[in-house]
Amino acid sequence: MTTPFVLAVPSKGRLQENADAFFGRAGLTLAKPRGARDYRGTITGLDNVEIAYLSASEIAAQLARGQVHLGITGEDLVRETIADADKRVMLIEGLGFGYANVVVAVPQAWIDVRTMADLDDVATSFRVKHNRRMRVATKYINLTRHFFALHGIVDYRIVESAGATEGAPASGAAELIVDITTTGATLAANGLKMLDDGMMLRSQANLVASRAADWTPEARETARVILDHIASRARAAKYKEVRTCLPGCDAALLSEIEQHFGALAPFGTPPAGGILTLHCPPAQLYPLGTLLRARGAETVSIGSLDYVMARDNPLFSRLEAFLGA
């Protein structure tokens, strides 16, 4: 029996909803044939694919171990969980959801502390004054150590946080924190501020590939099909389709259209009296339509694109280069 291709997807909440919607837009419908509470699923129409519904943190761990081929998880968890991440996994595509910034935040009462250099001064004076190191509450232990080392800060110790990290300074459990934030509102509500240069990582949900997975020829072909769907949808999302008939259309006009509007003619110059098809960025639709009518078009129709399939599969080409022969 062929070993299944395993795609790991977040098991609950907005991440799962967004992941399901992302694959659905790409024409890949995730299904749970044995019921909504099952933690295994399939992709409709793709044989030998197993969907593993896991927590985002467990997905990162299983990618590291090679137990899944592809997975959706946050870059913050990839960088925190996987040592030498760029050698062991590949961030194939940012998915446009699950945004979070990993930041260094200190009490607002520290009015003279605005940068990591200021924090270094505080760390040194804190140890002299209190005969102990200042405490940093976080669940991002590895990211914190790396970032603080880059800034030459050594006089601190990490207090591991399981949750509600932003409350640690107020409770006396730590002097400052490293945590995720989107708007900064929760930090402010807890009397904290982000340092001016305290942005450690801008994270979002990513489609990630594991180098250590069993990449048989069958697994690579499955990945090719999945990534072709995703790339086709991504191409379509960038353009609208413009169709018209022109009394005269030549290569010079198409070059002008591409140069001024970023619009492409995927099928080239039409024959005399034929329909010209263009793919145009949405922001340039009206100016392009104005030009086409000025050049003799009686009607210009504009429609949405579901998928734009091309011979190229850039996502899979990058994966192949990462995996090697």
UniProtKB/Swiss-Prot annotation:
One of its GO terms (molecular function) is ATP binding. Pathway: Amino-acid biosynthesis; L-histidine biosynthesis; L-histidine from 5-phospho-alpha-D-ribose 1-diphosphate: step 1/9. Its main location: cytoplasm. GO terms for biological process: L-histidine biosynthetic process. It is found in: Cytoplasm. Keywords: Amino-acid biosynthesis, ATP-binding, Cytoplasm, Glycosyltransferase, Histidine biosynthesis, Magnesium, Metal-binding, Nucleotide-binding, Transferase. Its EC number is 2.4.2.17. It is an enzyme of class 2 (transferase). Its cofactor is Mg(2+). NCBIfam families: hisG. Catalyzes the condensation of ATP and 5-phosphoribose 1-diphosphate to form N'-(5'-phosphoribosyl)-ATP (PR-ATP). Has a crucial role in the pathway because the rate of histidine biosynthesis seems to be controlled primarily by regulation of HisG enzymatic activity. This is ATP phosphoribosyltransferase. It comes from Afipia carboxidovorans (strain ATCC 49405 / DSM 1227 / KCTC 32145 / OM5). The gene is hisG.
